[in-house]
UniProtKB/Swiss-Prot annotation:
HAMAP family hit by this protein: UPF0250
GO cellular component: cytosol
InterPro entries listed in its UniProt record: UPF0250_YbeD-like, YbeD-like_sf
Protein name: UPF0250 protein ECA1299
Pfam family, one: DUF493
């Protein structure tokens, strides 16, 4: 029997996205812009460069209110051109 994500998470809850993308100045702004559309708030993302400096990881934490919000953010963050992966 498969357990669905929404059966494991009780909403509202704190949810952190880790977005890895090219080390371009606009990465953080693009991530925050997408998050603001679905979970408006005051965000201070954490940015960490890769060892060679080609990529940055942007961690941003929201208060998720429902599973559709979580899934939509995964999809839209992944659709940003310079993003390579969303965890």
């Amino acid at each position: 029997m498969k357990t669905k994500l929404n059966e494991l998470i009780e909403f509202p809850c704190v949810f952190t996205y880790k977005v890895m993308g090219e080390a371009k100045p606009e990465l953080v702004d693009l991530v925050v812009e997408v998050v603001q559309r679905h979970a408006p708030g005051d965000y201070t993302p954490q940015i960490k460069p890769s060892s060679k400096g080609n990529y940055h990881s942007v961690s941003i934490t929201i208060t998720a209110t429902h599973i559709e919000q979580v899934e939509t953010l995964y999809e839209e963050l992944g659709n940003i051109d310079i993003v390579r992966m969303v965890l």
